[in-house]
Amino acid sequence: MSERRAKRPKISRGEDDFLPGNIIEIELHNFMTFNHLVCKPGSRLNLVIGPNGSGKSSLVCAIALCLGGEPQLLGRATSVGAYVKRGEDSGYVKISLRGNTREENLTIFRKIDTRNKSEWMFNGSTVSKKDIVEIIQKFNIQVNNLTQFLPQDRVCEFAKLTPVQLLEETEKAVGDPQLPVHHRALVEKSRDLKQLERAVAKNGETLNQLKALVDEQEKDVERVRQRELFLTKVDSMKKKLPWLKYDMKKAEYMDAKKRMKEAEKKLDEAAKNLNSMKEPIEKQKKEKAETDSKCKKVKNLMDANGRNRCHLLEKEDEADARVVATYKELEELKKQEEHRQERILKATEDLVAAERELQNLPVYERPVAKLEELSSQVTELHHSINGKKNQKEDNEKLLSQKRYTLRQCVDKLKDMENANNKLLKALANSGADRIFDAYQWVQQNRHEFKREVYGPVLVEVNVPNRENACFLEGHVSFYIWKSFITQDPEDRDLLVKNLKRFDVPVLNYVGNSGNQKAPFHISDQMRSLGIHARLDQIFDAPDAVKEVLNSQFGLEDSYIGSKITDQRAEEVYKLGIKDFWTPDNHYRWSSSRYGGHSSASVDSVYQSRLLLCGVDVGELEKLRSRKEELEDSILFMEETHKSLQTEQRRLEEEAAKLHKEREEIVNVSYLEKKKRRELESRYQQRKTKLESLEQEEDMDASVAKLIDQASRANADRYTYAINLKKLLVEAVAHKWSYAEKHMASIELERKIRESEINIKQYEKTAQQLSLAVEYCKKEVEGKQQRLATAKRDAESVATITPELKKEFMEMPTTVEELEAAIQDNLSQANSILFINENILQEYEHRQSQIYTISTKLETDKRDLSICMKEIDSLKEKWLPTLRQLVGQINETFSHNFQEMAVAGEVSLDERDTDFDQYGIHIKVKFRESGQLQVLSSHHQSGGERSVSTILYLVSLQDLTNCPFRVVDEINQGMDPINERKMFQQLVRAASQPNTPQCFLLTPKLLPELEYSEACSILNIMNGPYIAEPSKVWSLGDSWGSLNRRRTEASQCS
């Protein structure tokens, strides 16, 4: 078969057979299935083969992510963190691209971590993703183009591409880089063209309609303008009307101002007359004040004289009273002397009687011994009472402490019971919707059970070390946590009957006395591997609950290790431990029933969602026991307190009786002493009284003394009478003087009153004048304000200008005439009738619309012409080139398809100016009797679509402008014949001089295939025994180079 020529010139290959942009090395670390991988692909066709799951697609994902692709285009995980190898925090991908020369290598490095963060480097320097994208765009690398980069998970998407999408992808992948640019520009221009055509048609129609309406309205508009002329004249007259009213207000203001000045003049004359009448009155008031002052002085002398006279009269009355008292005292003295002798006789008799009574009173001896005995007994009782009080206080303090401790215990129990509610809520949130109802039913009906019933199991289990909770929860199935456990068959039947509606399991524990529990022992070897506990030892629960968990889930065979155990899992398995947990993973080994082969599984450890909500069951039981102990202790102490209180009350009553007896003895002693003291005091008082009566002075001396006192009092009375006479004469003189001056003052007051009456009449007249002035002022102010308002109103209507003043001169000069003229013009305007009041506005608005739309229409026509020229220009550049490109693809595709099937063709679907509808149709025929059908899932099988797809991609090989192409498992579903033909096509295409680098990933290859030097095979092997061989191949040597070395070695030997 003759070689077909290349369709267009390519960049020549270098001496190393690589093109610029080819991938020369791929390095992966902690990426998907690989710990570390270094791959050096060939320059042409690279067959990446390996079993399913070995990591072929990992290589595709690495190329896409390192060359700026997003996770979404791979059709797998949507975040870069998902591509980090499981169990690792970060990984990286490094790809080396061939530069423009053999020595120039471009290294792109991308580091990713589980937090979805990326770090980019180019040739060892940190850069941004934008810089990386710019670099790969220089080589036309498009990882988002399905014709260049077809991952396994997006193969089906390529077959689903519509003709329009297929054309877009083909333009990006092959041909002139300006093709997709011109296509997008044509699509945008065609949209603009359609919009402009619609706008021109719409505006032309609107313009014609508006012109027809304007022609109909012209006659009505002329009548409206005539009416507007009359109304304009009315408006001009209305402008003069407020100025005429302003002139009238101004004349009224000037008249009011004149009247105000006349009133002010009259007020000034009245004020002068009033001041001339006030001067004589002031002189009379001054003279009256001097007369009143003299009257006041005489009045003061009269008052002083009266006070002196009153003082003398008082003294005279006092002296008269002394005389009368002295005479009475003389008479009383005579009577007292007669009674004194009688009192002396009576006092002598009383003294003798008191002395006799005191001598006859017996002597009282106090019972001291009895009192001391009673005091001693009372003291002892008080000591006993104080002891009981101290005991009671100590008991009260201890009782208070116990009650406080009990309250704390009860509060803690409530908190822990609330924690049980949290556990029940966690179960409800996990799917056990009615677990609360089941729990409450069991609690309310516990009296009906024969033996203890436990449940839900989650409430009964306590994990002291919370770090172990995730292991136990991960090992035990969820259904067990919501289960109830009975220990009697009848209890089980009762629970099943009543809890069935709540959807909770019921398990019956019958005991397991026959089986002995395996002892827990950690050997030194296990401890060295990090094993430190067994799963059945990490939690506390009632025996029945624990036995059920052990029997159901084999907790005795599951161990707990550390991070060291993670690293030495294989050694742990060799000890016979087939199930163990580490902080991050759960390891399990199982043996095949047939061949006895062992297989291992590793699962991640997830955070506990149920057990970490729980409480310590042991602590809960301790708190309940402690609560009962405290309640018993408090009850005992309360009884003790009551007995101490009773004993104290008895001792206090006994002490009160003794105290009362002692008080009675003391009272008797006190009364006897008091009685003797009273008799002695009575005797002494009577003796003193007798001596006092005997020592009273003589009667004659007292009478002489009283007569002398009466004589002195009579002399004082005479002196007072003489002085009183002098004061009476002086008082008469003062009275006469006061009367004269007072009459003169009354006369002056009368004259002043008459003058003031006259002045008041003048003041009233002046006040009336003042009110008249104020009224005139207010009138002027009112006129002034109305004048200012009239001026503002007039100015708001129109400002006087020379032109307006000239118009005003032609109008009537009075308000009445002007108003009549306004009414005449309004009548004439109103006589012009028309149907549409807004006819003028509509006419002017339509004229404006006609102008706007005409301008817009001219602009749109001009833009339409320019747009059509631009489209024609772009179309001449784009369509011939595209037709030629599709023709070349069709030529290659038809030739390749004839070798594999019956017939196939690629055609361009042209849609005139609907450039967004242009597309590429792939039509194929696999049977001679059939017809060419468009490639789709309705007409072809999966294998036929795969053959068609790969042949289309091969047809693009020698037209492509990209450095490499990736196709993942495109031969899946092909029959052996088509697969062999397809492979030969790929090998032949790869042998072309300028064919781009190609990666073909497949899990299978047919035997006896023909290979060429342009074909490189990358065999991916993965598994537990690949570590040692990978070290041998770490240099990246190929099988061919190894064979050459062996041949050379054999020749040398």
Curated annotation (Swiss-Prot):
Functional description taken from the UniProt entry: Core component of the SMC5-SMC6 complex that promotes sister chromatid alignment after DNA damage and facilitates double-stranded DNA breaks (DSBs) repair via homologous recombination between sister chromatids.
Protein residues bound to ATP: 50-57
Organism: Arabidopsis thaliana (Mouse-ear cress)
Region Flexible hinge, residue ranges: 432-616
Subunit structure comment from the entry: Forms a heterodimer with SMC6A or SMC6B. The SMC5-SMC6 complex is composed of the SMC5 and SMC6 heterodimer attached via their hinge domain and from the non-SMC subunit NSE4A or NSE4B.
Record protein name field: Structural maintenance of chromosomes protein 5
The entry's keywords: ATP-binding, Chromosome, Coiled coil, DNA damage, DNA recombination, DNA repair, Nucleotide-binding, Nucleus
Mutant lacking the gene: phenotype: Lethal when homozygous.
Tissue specificity: Expressed in seedlings, rosette leaves and floral buds.
Family the entry assigns: Belongs to the SMC family. SMC5 subfamily.
Ranges of residues in domain Zinc-hook: 23-991
Pfam families, A to Z: SMC_N (PF02463)
Biological process, per Gene Ontology: DNA recombination; DNA repair; sister chromatid cohesion
Molecular-function annotations in GO: ATP binding
Coiled coil (residue ranges): 182-431, 617-798
Phylogenetic placement of the source organism: Eukaryota, Viridiplantae, Streptophyta, Embryophyta, Tracheophyta
Record localization: Nucleus; Chromosome
One GO term describing the cellular component: chromosome
